[in-house]
Amino acid sequence: MSDKPTMLILSGFLGSGKTTVLLQLANHLRAKHGEDYRIAIIENEVGSASVDTGVIAEAGYSVTEMLAGCVCCTLIGQLVPAVQKLTEELDPDLIVLEATGMATPSTMRDNIERYGDCPVRVLTIVDASRWQRIVRALSVLLTEQLECADVICVNKCDLADDAQIGEVDAAVREMNASAPIVHASAISPMSAADLDAIAGV
């Protein structure tokens, strides 16, 4: 592997489906590259416990928890040391940070690229079925999460009709003109091409 693992930041509001997409991506990369491909996962929650850690660990992946704060603000000083420790102890090919829903990915990216010395990609996941509610309530943060993204996943397309999905795609494209947009649904797995787009390979 490269001396410097790639870091993938998963951005998106609570309930957008970050953990589900994470597991699909991790399983795809393991199947593609073999069991020697090492993936380290950082789970960030503002609460004192993460409901997703057990699910990820049961799937066979190493999980580091950063709890009781957000890694873009109150825990930002702990992020680079955590990445450095994972790199030294696990020698991963990929580090995935599943950020809390209210995190601003640009802050994390800047911190890791400046002090953690590894390349960073940002995947922002949006819930097509709740798009209008999120836009009304959290438009500034949503815009920041989308503008920073290298790739965008419009998720839960099974809960939205074609018109809604088209509306989301158009709005997303206004906020980020260049990032690839992929679609995900609970009733069908993401394609290998879409998962490769997320991973940047």
Where are these regions (language model features)?
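Nucleotide-state-sensitive switch-loop elements of NTP-binding domains
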Residues: 2-11, 16-135
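Residues in and immediately flanking transmembrane alpha helices
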Residues: 58, 111, 140, 168-169
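Short hydrophobic alpha-helical segments of the AMP-binding
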Residues: 112, 146, 172
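Well-ordered beta-strand positions
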Residues: 121, 150-151
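Flexible active-site lid/hinge loop adjacent to a nucleotide/diphosphate
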Residues: 136-148
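Canonical P-loop GTPase G-domain recognition
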Residues: 143, 151-201
